[in-house]
Design a protein with these regions (language model features):
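Sequence signature of WD/YWTD-type beta-propeller architectures
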Residues: 1-389
Length: 389
């Protein structure tokens, strides 16, 4: 194997260099955040003593006992660096986000910039201009495409939508493709639904926006284009949130249970929004919020995935899939002809040399054309991957 891969799993960054073993890359900045938080908790520990009494410290001071497992630090995106041996990655904490440069040959990390409440994901560097495209997320549930030049970040899309997964077009310094879905809001302004994802092409110089793929029955995700103009993307059936079909005999039960189901639906949607913005579930009644390796639920391209259920249902396979076979990797030629590349695809990437790699969520494969795919990596809950040059 002569390929360098970086992939994300539950907010952690992993790197595989050729045939060497996979190694996790830990951010020193992120670890410093954790250490400072723990030290602050320890300094204030006396305020939380005596919690077994009616007027314990926590009640008097309005603070809660800290749990270092609940400290939210995650790597949110990765792309190529400016020189060989380097990669860029985005990092998110509770109140700060930033862009970092990592040299794997020297094991050195350098902070390029950080800002309060910055949430950037889906990084993609333009090899000629060094512009970095990304998805920037906001507390109201929207996300826009932005470009980073040096330490400056500029939004290039806008609207009440979820704009994600930008990718530069080969040979074009000023064009990129991305996926976008509109948000539906009620009269009070709360987001209540997400439309189908479409694929758009944007010219940064002229501001021209062209729709490449759109269908109310499907989501089109993670667009990538090769030098020949072939468009690669993930296609999956669109699901309207909360849409279900019940038999007439269950109508009475539906009426009786309507208030409960309405409350449950509202909670699950708020949980969805929490996962979208902070990647943290709201279900903390059973204990503290734990960013642990055994997390059972994750948000993958606008869809909440029950990882435990998905892996159980595909356990009969040698390598179980995190997503169903309806998540298809498609190659679409400029003529409009489409070919199925693989099924059960959660993420993929391709480079200018024609390498195409994809993941089913638990492993990474290299596509070999007509032959069987080559297994490269076995992992767990793989959310995103990038070929590093």
């Amino acid at each position: 194997m002569d390929l360098k891969l970086a992939y994300l799993s539950q907010g952690k960054l992993f790197f595989k260099l050729n045939d060497l073993a996979v190694r996790q890359i830990d951010s020193r900045f992120g670890q410093d955040v954790i250490n400072r938080t723990i030290q602050r908790q320890q300094r204030n520990e006396w305020k939380t003593q005596g919690q077994g009494t009616p007027f314990g410290g926590a009640m008097l001071w309005g603070v809660t006992q800290g749990d270092q497992r609940a400290i939210h630090v995650q790597i949110s995106g990765v792309t190529n660096g400016t020189r060989e041996g380097e990669m860029l990655f985005g990092l998110e904490t509770e109140g700060v986000g930033g862009l970092f440069l990592y040299d794997w040959s020297k094991d050195e990390e350098r902070r390029l910039f950080h800002k309060e409440n910055l949430r950037i994901r889906d990084l993609a560097r333009q090899p000629e201009t060094d512009l970095v495209a990304c998805s920037q997320y906001f507390p109201n549930g929207t996300a826009n495409i932005a470009v980073i030049k040096g330490t400056e970040l500029h939004q290039i899309t806008e609207g009440d939508s979820l704009d994600e997964a930008p990718a530069w077009l080969p040979g074009a310094r000023n064009k990129l493709v991305f996926q976008s879905a509109g948000l539906a809001r009620n009269a009070q302004g709360y987001a209540v639904g997400l439309g189908p994802f479409a694929i758009h092409e944007l010219n940064l110089d002229t501001g021209t926006l062209a729709t490449l793929l759109e269908d109310p029955k499907f989501d089109f995700l993670c667009p990538r284009m090769n030098a020949e103009g072939d468009l690669f993307f993930i296609r999956r059936p669109y699901e309207t949130p909360g849409r279900s079909h019940y038999p007439i005999t269950g109508l009475l039960a539906d009426v009786v249970l309507f208030p409960f189901r309405l409350s449950r639906a509202l909670f699950h949607f708020l949980n969805f929004m929490s996962l979208t913005f902070s990647r943290k579930p709201l279900t903390t009644a059973a204990g503290p919020k734990v960013e642990a390796p055994d997390q059972k639920t994750l948000l993958l391209r606008g869809r909440i995935i029950d990882a435990e259920k998905a892996l159980r249902e595909s356990a009969q396979n040698e390598i179980p899939s995190l997503v169903p076979p309806t998540w298809e990797l498609i190659k679409r030629r400029p003529s409009g002809e489409e070919n199925l590349v693989a099924k059960s695809v959660a993420a993929f990437d391709l480079d200018l040399d024609g390498n195409l790699v994809y993941s089913n969520g638990t492993a990474i494969f290299r596509s070999s054309g007509a032959g069987a795919p080559q297994l490269l990596v076995k992992g767990k809950l793989i959310e995103n991957l990038t070929i590093i040059r």
